[in-house]
């Protein structure tokens, strides 16, 4: 560990403006090339069961947003890939690392179905079994773009890249409904942005910053410190299109949002590292995505550029430190 490393999180950083070179923020290009495709913004909704389902995946793909389908209905995945291919849309799925997941990859190959993106999605992604799965996918589906995670160190990023991962997902427990940092004492909660920076310096391939993003400005900060894409859960939870269960309390509508390792997800109280919260329902997801794009356009105009590249060069100051990243526990 680098003892001289600066430790900070999103709320601790303010970026310093440069001279603006655009007449209007509408001139700013927020698109990002990630793997073989280009997307409107460098943002992907979290691959969680309370955030994404098949209809939303279709909508996102149709509107040039990146998505990753969750892995909690494994029996649906083959048909989902087939359906997306039929529609002429990108197919992007998640897999775990249990034995039957290795069989599933072979079944995809046997059916001549190659998803555009496959995300190996486990809480502690710096593991031999993840390396085995990367190599397995690359053997059977060599044209799939493989995202592996989650990790929190440069060593992990390098090993997964060397195994064949095309991108890595950085973040151990910084999410709003993730309890890993409190239950285990491990993770990047409270220093997620510094972890992104640390990992990005070692990476040769793209990084997805996953977790801890609480405001739209945090997307720009992630890009500044080396992320190509940001995975976001809580800001997307509670929309009309998101699949979390709706609850009515005193005439107000709320939606359930829970972590992928919560008892609500697992249906069991063993090895729980996630919790459930209720969020007010907040309209259409398209409006939130548009607002994210507009805020990113403004951020680029402050950076003095015309596209996302300009964010990577701005100066910044560290204003304070807070281990809980703005969440009151």
UniProtKB/Swiss-Prot annotation:
The keyword Iron-sulfur does not apply. The active site is at 178 (thioimidate intermediate). One of its GO terms (biological process) is purine nucleotide metabolic process. Pfam families: IMPDH. One of its GO terms (cellular component) is cytosol. Belongs to the IMPDH/GMPR family. GuaC type 2 subfamily. This is GMP reductase. The gene is guaC.
